[in-house]
């Protein structure tokens, strides 16, 4: 999807514009689901003092300063990262980033409780069986391995990031919400 927009549009548009189009298409395809999670998490954890207040802020449909800044910083980092590599590398890097970041997000469900709308443990979260984890693991890791040593370094960085997020989410609210998973996905991508 979005990686193909960059690959194909760079023939008649400047690389910068092609990357921006690719980012916009990616947001459009996902309905900004993960970006919304990042913004809500940034607002909640940035402005909230206790678990109840954090979750209340995260549920608020308006975006605050923390949320807006987090989106700007993450989009800028994505843009600069893609801009720093050759156009030929972008499709694989893009696919690998999407794949590993989604695996990283659901990986938070292993050590943490999923908190429902009330902030209590929720049984409504889809339970993944061993086959689901195997498919998620292979599809999340394989594209990154195709990047060689740089892909391996990226996986280590994402693992460290998500260990930190896991500790932070557990300490601040006692688990994860869907917004936390979206934040993890965006920060890992």
Regions from the language model: what does each represent?
Residues 1-6:
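Short, small-residue-biased leader/transition segments that mark boundaries at the very start
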Residues 51, 103-137, 173-176:
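Solvent-exposed interhelical
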């Amino acid at each position: 999807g979005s990686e193909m927009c960059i690959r194909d549009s760079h023939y008649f548009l400047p690389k910068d514009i092609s990357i921006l189009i690719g980012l916009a298409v990616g947001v459009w395809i996902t309905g900004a689901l993960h970006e919304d999670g990042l913004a809500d998490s940034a607002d909640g954890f940035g402005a909230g003092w206790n678990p109840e207040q954090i979750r209340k802020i995260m549920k608020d449909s308006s975006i605050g300063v923390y949320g807006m800044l987090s989106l700007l910083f993450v989009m800028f980092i994505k843009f600069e990262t893609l801009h720093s590599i050759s156009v030929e590398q972008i499709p694989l890097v893009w696919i690998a980033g999407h794949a590993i970041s989604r695996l990283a997000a659901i990986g938070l469900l292993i050590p943490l409780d999923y908190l429902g709308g009330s902030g209590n443990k929720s049984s409504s979260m889809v339970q993944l069986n061993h086959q689901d984890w195997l498919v998620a693991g292979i599809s999340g890791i394989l594209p990154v391995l195709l990047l060689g040593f740089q892909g391996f370094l990226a996986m280590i960085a994402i693992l460290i990031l998500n260990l930190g997020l896991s500790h932070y989410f557990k300490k601040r609210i006692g688990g994860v919400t869907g917004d936390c998973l979206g934040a993890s996905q965006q920060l890992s991508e």
